[in-house]
């Protein structure tokens, strides 16, 4: 897992940040294949484990060469993924949110704020925020399809109705010609943590 995180420029100095993220050396992908895997707990707002997010890895620390290197475990019948997140850090009054796990880790490392991974655009729209949080920074993916940007705006509007200040933090760089989008992990890898804006909570 350390090799994979390093390949994504994710240098985690605070072990508590990834206390819900673990490495398994031999995880079943299907009936005939096993791979090393980075496995993260997906929890609801009450902190209850709902499912597991698995990233299958190659021995050299990259994503495994399979059709779906990222998967969620099957949900129990009495659970829903809506509102859940991989909770990287415990918020006080300020929380950052992002889509993918690597993006959320990038934000947490660069800004020092806890950042929850909502897994995807739908998860970003539906994530539930603790009552103690008064300011949310939404680190939006920048997609050609506008999916990430629209999800961020949907969350911002919902939080505003709840009396929570939500600020969208957008990637200003252009999307590379060969890519469908760009996110904050791309910024961290290309430019380092100093390329992130300085975030100050508003009280």
Where are the predicted features?
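Generic hydrophobic, helix-prone segments enriched in Leu/Val/Ile
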Residues: 13-22, 55-57, 84-86, 152-155, ...
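TOPRIM fold recognition
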Residues: 92-95, 101-203
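Short regulatory "switch" loops immediately downstream of catalytic or recognition motifs
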Residues: 7-11, 57-61, 138, 170-173
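Generic short alpha-helical hydrophobic face used as a protein-protein interaction/packing hotspot
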Residues: 9-11, 51, 111, 188
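Phosphate-handling DNA/RNA-contact segment within nucleic-acid enzymes
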Residues: 29-131
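Short, solvent-exposed polar/charged micro-motifs at secondary-structure junctions
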Residues: 24-32, 63, 176-186
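TOPRIM metal-binding catalytic domain and adjacent DNA-binding surface shared by DnaG-type primases
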Residues: 1-38, 43-46, 89, 199-203
């Amino acid at each position: 897992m350390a090799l994979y995180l390093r390949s994504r420029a994710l240098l985690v100095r605070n072990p508590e940040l990834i206390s819900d993220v673990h490495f398994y050396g031999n995880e079943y992908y299907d009936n005939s294949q096993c791979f090393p895997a980075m496995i993260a707990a997906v929890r609801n707002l009450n902190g209850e484990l709902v499912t597991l997010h698995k990233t299958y890895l190659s021995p050299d620390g990259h994503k495994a060469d399979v059709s779906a290197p990222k998967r969620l475990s099957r949900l129990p019948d009495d659970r829903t993924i809506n509102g859940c997140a991989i909770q990287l850090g415990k918020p006080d009054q300020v929380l950052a949110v992002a889509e993918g796990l690597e993006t959320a880790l990038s934000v947490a490392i660069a800004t020092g704020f806890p950042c929850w991974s909502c897994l995807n655009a739908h998860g970003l729209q539906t994530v539930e925020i603790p009552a103690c949080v008064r300011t949310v920074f939404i680190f939006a993916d920048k997609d050609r399809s506008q999916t990430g940007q629209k999800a961020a705006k949907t969350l911002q509007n919902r939080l505003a109705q709840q009396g929570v200040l939500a600020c969208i933090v957008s990637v200003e760089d252009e999307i590379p010609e060969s890519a469908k989008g760009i996110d904050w992990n791309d910024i961290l890898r290309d430019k380092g943590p100093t390329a992130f804006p300085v975030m100050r909570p508003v009280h």
